């Protein structure tokens, strides 16, 4: 790809040390932007932990910035992260819900604290390695910015970005939105990035690769209680309701309990189906398609709409978890901070605390927190 000598302004790229943000920085420099790479440290604890890769990620990001030939800076947002993201994460788990901190991190840290910092550095835009696109359309009220799904639907991250607003989208560039992951890795190899084959990060950002129960146990009290079937039969003891999410199959500790069997005589798998916080009871059911695991509708709160106002009632697509295919649904009401969805086909393991995100084709409209 030839370099474009025409300067397009200053852009600060959030560089994590991974291949996506590294290629993002390179692409923008080739397009003629004055690029500044910024590494964000969002978690202070456990820097010496075997699970924490912050130091190596910082070294990787700095090395890439040097190779690409861009300015590189470091900022510590750990205090903001604990206050705006982690505290809410713990509150949600304490209430028996299963939050998605990456959604909140994007809205509060990567596209708020980071954006403010970048503007203070004299930037006109920020950029990240997210797989998504921004489109600006003219309306009678003026230009409106839309969040679109990425070209690579296997990597599309619009679900995690659905709480962004017009101001944030107006300042944001997503260079990878038109590329497939295979192309990104190919570019990284061609330009000699040492992290071209680096594994994508997985799991919740501040937990990393450590066992989830081990991490959560340090911050929330665990109160064991009964595991019951819908009929009230006790089939085990849970370690604390916070450690379980609806639809969970592994780690329930009820595998040896007899119950429904398949045609071949083997027992059907058990799934976490409901939580009763008042009684500290975890309900489990057998079979992936048990009625307790299926929901024909949902209610959501804390709604956030990218256009600044809710869409009209009507037919849309919705995701209730990342990488789920859009489920045909009807938006029945969207007033204030709440909305309701009715699905054409019942959805599996709709989980309170997760995000319900609404789409009109490739356009992400926004969403809310499932209750």
UniProtKB/Swiss-Prot annotation:
Q: Which domain of life is it from?
A: Bacteria
Entry binding sites for ATP: 14-21, 40, 129
Swiss-Prot/TrEMBL GO biological process terms: tRNA wobble position uridine thiolation
Q: Region Interaction with target base in tRNA: which residues?
A: 100-102
Pfam families hit by this protein: tRNA_Me_trans (PF03054), tRNA_Me_trans_C (PF20258), tRNA_Me_trans_M (PF20259)
Which Gene3D superfamilies does the record match to this protein? Adenine nucleotide alpha hydrolases-like domains (2.30.30.280), HUPs (3.40.50.620), Translation factors (2.40.30.10)
Site positions for Interaction with tRNA: 130, 354
Q: Residue ranges of region Interaction with tRNA?
A: 155-157, 321-322
Q: Which reaction does it catalyse?
A: S-sulfanyl-L-cysteinyl-[protein] + uridine(34) in tRNA + AH2 + ATP = 2-thiouridine(34) in tRNA + L-cysteinyl-[protein] + A + AMP + diphosphate + H(+)
Record's subcellular location: Cytoplasm
Q: Name one GO molecular function term.
A: tRNA-uridine 2-sulfurtransferase activity
Q: Does the entry annotate any disulfide bonds, and if so which pairs? A: 105-205
Query: One GO CC annotation, please?
Result: cytoplasm
Q: Which NCBIfam families match?
A: PRK00143.1, trmU
Tell me, what does this protein do in biology?
Answer: Catalyzes the 2-thiolation of uridine at the wobble position (U34) of tRNA, leading to the formation of s(2)U34.
HAMAP family from the entry?
A: tRNA_thiouridyl_MnmA
What name goes with this protein?
Answer: tRNA-specific 2-thiouridylase MnmA
Instruction: Give the organism, scientific name.
Output: Bordetella pertussis (strain Tohama I / ATCC BAA-589 / NCTC 13251)
